Amino acid sequence: MGLDAVIAEIKEKGRHEAETIVNEGSARKDEIMNAAKQEVEKIHLTVRDEVEKNLSHIISQEEAAAHLIVKRQVLNAQKDLMDQVYKQALDKIVSMPESFHEEAITSLLRKAKEEIPKGRVSCAARDEKILKNVLKQSEFSAYTFGSVIDTDGGIIVESDDGQLQVDYSYRTFLNQVWESGLKDASDSLFA
């Protein structure tokens, strides 16, 4: 399963959850609006002249408060959902089969080679065996195994002199993709 398919699956799930949240928020807004209208009716019956002077003001305040409450609830729910989608995406990537991680490490090392042609490569404990096998390939003969690091996956490459380092960990890569696509994802999920 490719990364695009995983992200598409997660987006679809997020879209369905977002619709549910928006519908619940709309129902809550309607409840608040109904309560506000009932309050206005009580005031209207007891102090008609006063209500006529202040009706527009009260309705505006109640609507603004209701909209603010609903908007805050929806935004909080959207943020929670986006955080869940991010975590699910990372978890899904991390749980991919060994062949995926081997392809990813090979691809990331080729990309790092453009910036650091020789150096040490570090990875997660789970990927140590995979990385050592990849480093045996002739195209990566200028690299040595660095160390096991605390990461979800991917690699960190450091030049031999320690002057340069590129972080191609899954989390860093996903953060870059996430930040660049966050608006698109948000628009897609909550449109």
Curated annotation (Swiss-Prot):
Disulfide bonds: none annotated. Gene3D superfamilies: ATP synthase, E subunit, C-terminal, F1F0 ATP synthase subunit B, membrane domain. Keywords: ATP synthesis, Cell membrane, Hydrogen ion transport, Ion transport, Membrane, Transport. GO terms for biological process: proton motive force-driven plasma membrane ATP synthesis. GO terms for cellular component: plasma membrane; proton-transporting two-sector ATPase complex, catalytic domain. It holds the Pfam family vATP-synt_E. It is found in: Cell membrane. GO terms for molecular function: ATP binding; proton-transporting ATP synthase activity, rotational mechanism; proton-transporting ATPase activity, rotational mechanism. InterPro entries: ATPase_E_C (IPR038495), ATPase_V1_Esu (IPR002842). SUPFAM superfamilies: V-type ATPase subunit E-like. The keyword Ion transport applies. Its main location: membrane. It is a peripheral membrane protein. Has multiple subunits with at least A(3), B(3), C, D, E, F, H, I and proteolipid K(x). Component of the A-type ATP synthase that produces ATP from ADP in the presence of a proton gradient across the membrane. Belongs to the V-ATPase E subunit family. This is A-type ATP synthase subunit E 1. It comes from Methanospirillum hungatei JF-1 (strain ATCC 27890 / DSM 864 / NBRC 100397 / JF-1). The gene is atpE1.
